[in-house]
Amino acid sequence: VTRAASSAASVALFPARPEDALEAAFEICRRLRDFNDRREEAGEYPVRIGIGIHTGQIMLGTIGENQRMDTTVIGDTVNLSSRIEGLTKAFGVTVLVSEDTVDRMGTRDRFRHMGRVRVVGREEGVDVYEALDAPATSTLETDPKVRWVNREAFEMGVQQFAAGRMDDAYRVFKKLYHDEPTDRAVIAYLKRIIYYRKKGLPDPWDGIFRVASK
């Protein structure tokens, strides 16, 4: 862990393999599940977290003066990781991974493609993926088995959305919502599709899911 990115977030580096970052994220989920189980037994609400993982070049250095020195990292990779972490709230998932990271791992079998998303502060979109085998952090989360089963249909709905076929996308996500009404990613897409069906698509349409907040 190199530094706190904000009052509620930290930045960690994994120089060897992207799988190391993913396994660290899973271990955080497992530890949080133990903590949340105790909270639920005490009648308290579980704590939720979001983890964003991206792979790329960074600048690492030491700043400050003799009285206080601090090692920190800067660069677009760091910023995008933070933005991806912010997307976990919009989609209601725990671990989101960039396409660059998924490609480095060499397989997409364990991920659900969430679409091409434009985050605050960036002009271009970025493809992000949910880590489907991330351990549940509380009993209130959607059953991961359901997401595995519905992954193909979800990704088909994302493709229809990206192609601008909102009626087809609506039918796909409506059925997914019927099958699992607690999947917040499905709800997020349904809300956006309903809006576009009512207001019409922007011209030109770029197929990007836009998120208004960090």
PLM segments and residue spans:
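Intrinsically disordered, low-complexity, charge-biased linker/tail regions
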Residues: 202-214
